[in-house]
Amino acid sequence: MAFLVLLLAQLLSAPPPPHIKMTASASAPEVQAGTTIRLFVDVTPDPKVHVYAPGAKDYLPIALAIMPRAGIKVGKLTYPKSQDWYFEPLKEHVPVFTTAFRLDQAITLGAPLKAGDRVTVAGVLNYQACDDAVCFNPVAAPVNWSVTVK
């Protein structure tokens, strides 16, 4: 229990992630047990910065990992359409995100969760941001959502 409290304290006090702006939201603040809801992460790369999209070979594409927890079944993560970016020095095309986009994660809340439970869903947004000259160190940014079971 102490570990969980410490983890939540770190998540809630984490500094903003570098090179992007990130906002977490849910499709509903309350959900019936057994119902699937959507968890969103809205990401806006800084000007002149891109993050790699799924399908980028030899690069670290953006990904969302939901921490395991009893009563939470993690569904599919949906990505928007990426942009094709041509990297001149290597003469290659790479899928990236350069403008605001939304990640859409499905989850289902079930047993042992019950009506009245307030659930914090914790996750980590993994990404690597780059500009035209340099790729920055990979980042694992904590993200969380609060949902009440009704």
Residue ranges and their predicted role:
Residues 1-10:
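Sec-dependent N-terminal signal peptides
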Residues 10-150:
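Extracellular/lumen-exposed scaffold segments
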